[in-house]
Amino acid sequence: MRRIAVMGAAGRMGKILVEAVQQRAPLTGLTAAIVRPGSTLIGVDAGELASLGRIGVPLSGNLESVAEEFDVLIDFTLPEVMLKNLAFCRKAGKAMVIGTTGLDAAQKQLLAEAGKDIPIVFAANFSVGVNLSLKLLDMAARVLAEDADIEIIEAHHRHKIDAPSGTALRMGEVIANALDRDLQKVAVYGREGHTGARERETIGFATVRGGDVVGDHTVLFACEGERLEITHKASSRMTFAKGAVRAALWLDAREPGLYDMQDVLGLH
């Protein structure tokens, strides 16, 4: 059995991750669940909090206190929290599955450095459908090449705090790499006022926030006389959680390295 710990187990995504881990029993088992220090929920059964019934795993407020109880940590928390957990797992030799978004270049470099010592799967989106979309985007960009104007439109719920989404940025990276462009130089984030004509090599991003939208992403390849749209719509966060658990299983006995969901699915 793959022993899995969930960080942020009392949060919206954390409770779904707890459920997803339990759904894969006996291949996986939730053996630790961590919440923020000082939380009033410390000691509460993680299964009961996730409406699964009692599973015998009390919420802990300290990762170090459960270090001997898990093999891999699933972490979808904020960047500053995740990086502290990364440092601990690197020192303790624990594998990680990381779904944190909003990382800057320096923070991503810390992930790469940690990957020299422990196996890590880091992805902006753990949905199988999204990762298949990334493969399709690579193909479309290479075939359409300079003939298409490319725009990425994403929509999420009102509570999401980073924009564009990590998934939208990853889509942009895949397209830019396929076209041998530097995304930092060609990305255009929103348009307003008198912008002038569209520069041909740019990749545009548009962001929508509202309601309870789980996650919609559309990439538009606009050519002369035709348009190609590649769209993915998530209707439940469980799709992300199931992908994260799949990644945790894939990491079993894996050599140290920084992997992504494309590696897990064999799409590279």
Swiss-Prot record:
Name of encoding gene: dapB
Family, as annotated: Belongs to the DapB family.
Binding locations of NADP(+): 36
Pathway annotation from the record: Amino-acid biosynthesis; L-lysine biosynthesis via DAP pathway; (S)-tetrahydrodipicolinate from L-aspartate: step 4/4
Gene3D superfamilies for this protein: Dihydrodipicolinate Reductase, domain 2, NAD(P)-binding Rossmann-like Domain
Keywords: Amino-acid biosynthesis, Cytoplasm, Diaminopimelate biosynthesis, Lysine biosynthesis, NAD, NADP, Oxidoreductase
InterPro entries referenced in this protein's UniProt entry, alphabetically: DapB_C, DapB_N, DapB_N_CS, DHDPR_bac, NAD(P)-bd_dom_sf
PROSITE patterns linked: DAPB
Protein name: 4-hydroxy-tetrahydrodipicolinate reductase
Catalytic residues (UniProt): 156, 160
EC number(s) stated in the UniProt entry for this protein: 1.17.1.8
Binding locations of (S)-2,3,4,5-tetrahydrodipicolinate: 157, 166-167
Function: Catalyzes the conversion of 4-hydroxy-tetrahydrodipicolinate (HTPA) to tetrahydrodipicolinate.
